Amino acid sequence: MKTIRYPLSKKVLKMKNKVSLIIAVYKRVDFLELIFKSLENQTFRDFQVIIAEDDCSPMVKHFLEEKERNFPFEIKHISQEDNGFRKNILLNKAMRVADGEYLIFIDGDCILDKNFVEDHVKNAKPNVCLFGRRVMLDPKTSERLVKTKDFKYLSFMKLLFTKTGHLESAIRFPFFISWRKTGVLGCNFSVFKEKMIEINGFDEDFTRPLFGEDTDIERRLTLIGVKLQCSKFQTIQYHLHHPTKDRDEDWKISGELYERKVKEGKSVCDNGYIKR
């Protein structure tokens, strides 16, 4: 694993970061550009950014080296060779280098609303895992965003006339408390680091997508008494459309492993943040 620490810009040399935003990235530098633009627009600005790259792309490295010169946040970059789905391994590595007491997890295909980090931070509670939803952008809108880098295409009125899915999740009600208590998504959740360490982080037995990076985390956090709180209509993010492979086999393999984990009933995984 390579870990690169980019120096702080002068704007944040005096800041004490207590929040770490962990971004799981895979190849798409064009998506990363849009994410960074959305980070620069954040209303809450006292956080560090950790790029957790499941690859060792020279393009990503070059992008981050260029970006850190004027970027108003500390950036850390960790990477690993692209040897299949190893997201949980990567996320545990990211947790180890995170300086923040509070961790926010997103994926590298999601543009953030300007209030995204603030919404997570203002709703943070010691024994609560906060989880949001996402707006599913249609292919045409995603392509426009990649080409133009213009966030005007994210306005509700423009999206209203597209094939974007879950558009209701783009509506922001800052004081709304959702009734939903299940459904953590790995692309949009936050929790205190000490709680993630208490369950020994992400279970690296999951070597296929689905379940391991969110559903299993939800299960084990609940077992140690952490309450789940949905932040729908806050912590808004927009998922960029991209091709995906058929996931029938992933659902089967990951689902069967998850069922075994449920039967074991353990809150602390053996093959996680610390190897037991």
Where are these regions (language model features)?
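Glycine-rich, basic loop-to-helix element that forms the pyrophosphate-binding segment
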Residues: 81-98, 115
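A conserved acidic beta->alpha catalytic loop
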Residues: 38, 53-64, 110
